[in-house]
Structure formats: structure tokens, C-alpha cells
């Protein structure tokens, strides 16, 4: 087998993937589907960068945080960001959290 350079796949604070939530996305089912999709896209992205890890790990109860945030801020556009919580090389676990940001209209 070929030896792979043990390069960094992601750095702490890197936004790996993001998505803008529109008004029609602001329901629990749509949010859950988008989060699952974002995590799948994140996994695909890190594999494209050369990661040998089969899954990404998440930290925190971000689904509740996102749902609560949206309920308190109706009729606003939001951006979900999948952010790396640590530097990770090819064979190291990828640890992420999903942040939600208000977008100015």
C-alpha cells in the first residue's frame, strides 16, 4: 500500500459546509433533514480532502439550540455552519458542531 502524507484535513474553526435557511425551511422536519444533509455533505467533503475516517463526530445538543433560536427569531434568514472544533489529520477523528447565524436582510 502507498503511504499517505499525514496532512491536515481541517483546522480548528474551519467552516466545512454551510446552508442558508429560508422562511419555508423553518419547521422541525425541514431543519432535521437539512442538518442530516449537511452532516452527510461534510463527511463527503472531508473524504474528498483525503480523510480516512468513516464518520464525523458532533458535540453538543445543537438541534435543540437551533430549534430554540429559530423559534425566538421568526421571519429572519439563517445560516447553518458546520465548524471544525479541532485540527484533524488524515486518520484523526473529525469533531464538529453546527452553529446558527442570523443573516441581515
Segments and roles (model prediction):
Residues 1-105:
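Membrane-proximal structural modules of membrane-associated proteins and complexes
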